[in-house]
């Protein structure tokens, strides 16, 4: 978590992990917060890797946040936990999120819908659903039961 922020205190690292919803699984590791993680992420699930990355971003506290397909390879149950962490991370900062899973951007102040490299729609989630255009079609296709 402290990678890229070597002067962070242990308390700051733990606080970032708690805010990212990663603390619970970290303390269950044999090495806890002293666990060394290899390049491939070891035996962590995709969701756990995401939460660790979110904790790292929270610790560095960037003014602008760029997220690219942040929930693309996790299951829906884990996505809820990761989304809660993202909501915490994005609060009070400018965030650009590239997403195909529309649940990731549902709470955005402004959504730009792109197709073939062009912006074709713009608005909040509710505005785009009400417009009944491309975004609404995508949303219905993702959440059809």
Q: What does each model-identified segment do?
A:
Residues 25:
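Conserved phosphate-donor
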Residues 1:
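Catalytic-loop signature of eukaryotic-like protein kinases
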Residues 4-7, 14-22, 32-131:
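ABC-family ATPase nucleotide-binding domain "signature/switch" substructure
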Residues 130-145:
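C-terminal boundary and immediately downstream tail of ABC-type ATPase nucleotide-binding domains
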